[in-house]
Swiss-Prot record:
The lineage of its organism: Bacteria, Bacillati, Mycoplasmatota, Mycoplasmoidales, Metamycoplasmataceae. Belongs to the class-I aminoacyl-tRNA synthetase family. IleS type 1 subfamily. PANTHER family: ISOLEUCINE--TRNA LIGASE, MITOCHONDRIAL, SOLEUCYL-TRNA SYNTHETASE. IleRS has two distinct active sites: one for aminoacylation and one for editing. The misactivated valine is translocated from the active site to the editing site, which sterically excludes the correctly activated isoleucine. The single editing site contains two valyl binding pockets, one specific for each substrate (Val-AMP or Val-tRNA(Ile)). A motif ('HIGH' region) lies at residues 60-70. GO terms for molecular function: aminoacyl-tRNA deacylase activity; ATP binding; isoleucine-tRNA ligase activity; tRNA binding; zinc ion binding. Its EC number is 6.1.1.5. ATP binds at K596. Its cofactor is Zn(2+). It is found in: Cytoplasm. Monomer. This is Isoleucine--tRNA ligase.
Amino acid sequence: MSEIDYKETLNMPKTDFEMRANLTTKEPLFREKWEKDNLYARVLEKNKNNTPFVLHDGPPYANGSIHIGHALNKILKDIIVRYKSMCGFYSPYVPGWDTHGLPIELKMLTDAKINYKVISPIELRKRASEYADIQIENQISQFKSLQLLTDFKKIYKTKEPKFEAAQLKLFKKMVLDGLVYKGLKPVYWSPSSQTALAEAEVEYHDVDSPSIYVALEIIDQNGSQKVKNGDKLVIWTTTPWTLLANAAVAIGENFVYCRVEHNNQGYIVAKELANKFIEISKLDNAQISVDFNANELIGIKYKSVLNDLVCPVVIGHHVSLESGTGLVHIAPLFGEDDFQIGTANSLEMIMHVEDDGVLNDAAGKYKGIFYEKANAQIFDKLTSKSALLAKGTIRHSYPHDWRTHKPILFRGTPQWFVSIDKIRQQLLNELESINTYPEWAKKRLVNMISERKDWTISRQRTWGVPIIIFYDKDGKPVINSAIFDYVIDLVEKYGTDIWWEKEADELLPEEFRSNGYTKEMDIMDVWFDSGTTSLAVEIDEKLKPPYDLYLEGSDQYRGWFNSSLINSVAYTHKSPYKQIVSHGFVLDSKGEKMSKSKGNVVDPLKVIKKYGADILRLWVANAEYTNDVNISDEIINQNSEIYRKIRNTIKFLLGNLNGYEYDESVKRTGVHQYIYNELESIKEKVYKAYDEYNFSSVIKTINKYVVELSSFYLNITKDILYVHEFDSNERMMTLANFYDITNFLIKAIAPIIPTTAEDAYMHFYKKNKLESIHLENFDIVKPYDSNVLKEWEEFFSLKDEVNLLLENAIKSGLIKRTNEAKVTIKNPSEVIKGYDLKQLLMVGAIEFGNVSKVESFMSEKCNRCWNHFSPAQIKDNLCPLCYKIVQKVNGK
């Protein structure tokens, strides 16, 4: 028999599972198949009588294409839902969309080139609703490309009448329970959006602001022995335009103040800040003449420099000595602390800024100027009155509208609020029982709830859920349960458009009509909408909150996690969630935030088009997602390399399992016993990491496992697989292990790279095979012998030593391949002597001695297996095993 003919006697691997993944071609085909086969419904059916596990989807905003942050979020959720389903949990996942609010309203108006002031509310709402639906359809098609396991025909939208009615039932209960009130308070106000904002709608940017020191002349010393009429109180401000609403100067109750004398003029500042004031104001040769405590200043009157009011000096709880002068100008409607002080001291409440930021009649000659642009004229006025002592700029963090990215201000307006104080302790009590991943996040949420101020829930816009309040002839809110119920019934039937379509009387029960009632025209904060999802969304008729898991970005501690908790506790006195998992933001390779202007935006759809969704999903799983994560071509390529190793390993396993029928009764010995026990140990680690949502550990464990498996077990068993007789005992032990490893690997990767897992599963000759890998359950971890694993540690230490010797021998030219080497092992233990070291170390011969060394030994190569043997062992150019097999094939 010739050497070429020997190939016919070998057991060569064979599989149609391709080395090239072709994900971009295959993923749409698998997705189509899964939809056609109703895979998601069948997964639910499989587990319908089992313990439920519900990951409740926080709704993304129905505006624009998905970005890389969406991909990170949805893929993480999908991994968990798939994993839990394969663990046997009944795990329905209902995606939803946040559909109201200013971004949709503005984008619709911009795209349609319509002015907000000329379109009717009904037409605006109709167009906004249509726009939201178009955006949802667009995002659904994009989310599908992520290979998500869900039914996109069964989604929720916050604009659906059923949802809106549930939201209004919550609002009704909160009003009747005294949790909702209307009041005049300074709130975050966006001139660019012309509406109030909640804290969660505010972002901060570093900006340069004017920094000025202003002198206010005392006209009534109020009997003070230390202060004279004509002395000047010095305040420092970064918002000069608020001086038009100045109503008082606040001082620290326990601070020491002094008079700074300069050119016969006295300036009053805190003593601790006096030298800094002198330096900044360039008051050369100024002297600090007299000290006094705060009592000497209380009740003193001064003349406000811009509005000519006579104003008092009062105590301020917020005054500090960190910067400025220790005297703070108070404009009661332009700051929370200012408002408290203004209320406590019955100060003048001046509102000189309109909704759009333009100054009104109260600003006098500055009327008609945008508030920030008034600063230049104010500087001129102060200078003309010798009141501007110093002017500069300061760079600081300043609040901006998260939608328009333009500056906002604190502005006193009548708004609707949710009182947090009344339920704060309940909220904190509920947080005690929840778990967070990462663990430190729980403290973050507790701190936010502890410090949270009352929630401004009213918005001065049109596209949203109305605040269904009526006012009587005197302008007082009419709070009546029957009225609420009547409106809610109408909304459930017709949606909230009816609030704008009907007159007030048409929305009232008959007995309340013809009383001259008017409607509130503000809408609710969209965070109130999305915060209602646990109450308004029916995931399954038998499933109720609290749900097992909420998973969103870390910005949602002040957003959805926060509003959901408040709304749920207000309605049910219970948290809506048992556990929170949060992820960070996606940054570029340098750790910088992505922006179109920087040109560093990574589009997930482009990544999918180039690499496939499985590669993007692998990047997500492999990222330390609880922190901010990086993405770049290099990082994607690194994950592609991990993918390639996993795929090639599975291909090798499948190829060798061709035609094999699994026999779990096969008793494994030697290295095969070690591999069997190691596999169960790996399973345990992987399942534990999945349970802890530590997906990077899942990937690292699997990657390390396949790398080590390939370099050792898959390598040393090639002769057993190819050369031994098809049904030899050692080959059966090897293939039994291969089957178990393949079964584990395909299942373990299924939640993360579902297309690849399904592809591999189709080519896996599995007993009791199902129609899809995603209908399978994870196997339980079988008992394994850790002593076996420990026993083999000695061998692997020896293997590392021998490999180093072999590498040096090849480098020096002593041998070309390891199977040409004779290895002497120094004084091995009896355990080591018991191993088939020639096979395990893949060398030509093994000896034991007093020195470890590698030699080239006199050998001949077997023409069938290509291994080296001593010449005496070779017969007809074949080693003993190959000779025996060939003779058997030839019928001898």
